[in-house]
């Protein structure tokens, strides 16, 4: 089962409570990047292209706890970089569990065998192992041969030790629906508790700029994949059925970037997990000081092809709460994989992209250099 009954009940109660209180914007999952340092250099990743002085930064345990206290989300997803490079990661996970949060710890599994004894199985804790398809697909995606076998070994080890274990799979242009469906069958046989799948986002700093999916290609790809698995019912996904329905082109959704806010070494990232257009010092500043109407499909050029879960899963969850009847046909027959697509959001009036990455890097480097000797954070990586 991808989501435990306890998690479904707790998160559902939280969402309903927010609506009853009349809150228009609220966080569902805290996205935490406690460091950018990684032991891979994936072709489609735009998260690690920083100078060493920034790659060596990390969030302290106290900063990580402060982030969840500020935003109050019921779930935390810890990414990076590679989180297992963070020396204090076991303490961070324990701190979130002590606060009764549901924790997803993302990893490429290269260090999992070495680190797994530092963690204890808990129904509220899940490993999320990066696996972008079968052996050829995944090794090409991460630009290192042999990583697929290590990820599969990590899945088997985690399951043997009694951990809840899921995979996170990002798909790019050129992905073949038949191969992806066969891959989903294979990881299901491995006993994973769930699959998180999403199209890749076109990071401006990613090394490979040629293989990101357009919205049209995303919809066709997911219809092809899901049609080979009984509308997706053959597999256990961690995401809302309505989000999968959206990926298949059957829903017209605007994104809710505040539903999965990101805290990283720069601060609270504006406006979302994918776009670093600015940074706030506090969660409240992020929520109150971001002009949300400036971002999203049809509003901003960088958002044009985005269909990623960190922007649209929150929308799908809200839709399932406010219009629960939409879930019934999905439960009965799965995602519709034929017929016309739902209308898409027009792009005619989107504002042009602004490129601010270099400015943010320069400002962060200046901040690091201005610190007094002896006040530098400890090295992030081992």
What are these regions (language model features)?
Residues 22-27, 130, 255-256, 295:
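Residue-level marker of regulatory loop/turn positions in helix-turn-helix DNA-binding domains and
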Residues 48, 79, 130, 198, ...:
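Conserved residues at the C-terminal ends of beta-strands
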Residues 52, 85, 113, 136, ...:
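Generic structural signal for helix capping and beta-alpha/helix-loop junctions
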Residues 223, 233-329:
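Accessory C-terminal segments flanking Radical SAM cores
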């Amino acid at each position: 089962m991808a989501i435990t009954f306890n998690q479904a009940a707790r998160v559902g109660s939280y969402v309903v409570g927010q609506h009853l209180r009349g809150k228009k914007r609220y966080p569902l999952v805290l996205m935490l990047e406690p460091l950018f340092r990684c032991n891979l250099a994936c072709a489609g990743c735009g998260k690690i292209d920083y100078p060493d002085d920034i790659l060596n930064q990390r969030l302290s345990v106290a900063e990580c706890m402060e982030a969840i206290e500020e935003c109050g989300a019921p779930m935390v997803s810890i990414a990076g970089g590679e989180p297992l490079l963070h020396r204090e990661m076991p303490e961070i996970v324990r701190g979130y569990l002590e606060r009764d949060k549901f924790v997803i710890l993302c990893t490429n599994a290269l260090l999992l065998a070495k680190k797994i004894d530092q963690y204890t199985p808990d129904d509220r804790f899940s490993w999320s192992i990066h696996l972008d398809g079968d052996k050829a697909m995944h090794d090409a995606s991460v630009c290192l041969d042999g990583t697929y076998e290590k990820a599969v070994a990590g899945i088997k080890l985690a399951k043997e030790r009694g951990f809840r274990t899921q995979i996170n799979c990002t798909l790019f242009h050129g992905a073949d629906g038949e191969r992806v469906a066969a891959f989903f069958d294979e990881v299901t046989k491995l006993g994973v508790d769930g699959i998180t799948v999403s199209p890749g986002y076109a990071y401006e700093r990613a090394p490979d700029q040629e293989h990101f999916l357009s919205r049209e290609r995303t919809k066709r790809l997911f219809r092809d994949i899901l049609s080979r698995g009984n509308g997706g019912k053959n597999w256990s996904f961690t995401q809302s059925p309505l989000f999968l329905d959206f990926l298949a082109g059957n829903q017209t959704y605007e994104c809710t970037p505040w539903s999965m806010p990101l805290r990283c070494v720069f601060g609270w990232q504006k406006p979302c997990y994918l776009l670093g257009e600015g940074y706030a010092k506090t969660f409240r500043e992020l929520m109150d000081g971001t002009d949300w109407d400036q971002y999203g499909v049809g509003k901003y050029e960088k958002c044009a092809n985005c269909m990623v879960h960190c922007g649209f899963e929150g929308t799908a969850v809200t839709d399932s709460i406010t219009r629960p009847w939409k879930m019934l046909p999905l439960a009965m027959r799965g995602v519709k994989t034929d017929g016309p697509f739902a209308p898409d959001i027009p792009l005619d009036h989107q504002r042009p992209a602004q490129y601010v990455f270099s400015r943010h890097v320069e400002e962060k480097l200046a901040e690091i250099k201005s610190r007094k000797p002896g006040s530098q954070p400890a090295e992030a990586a081992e």
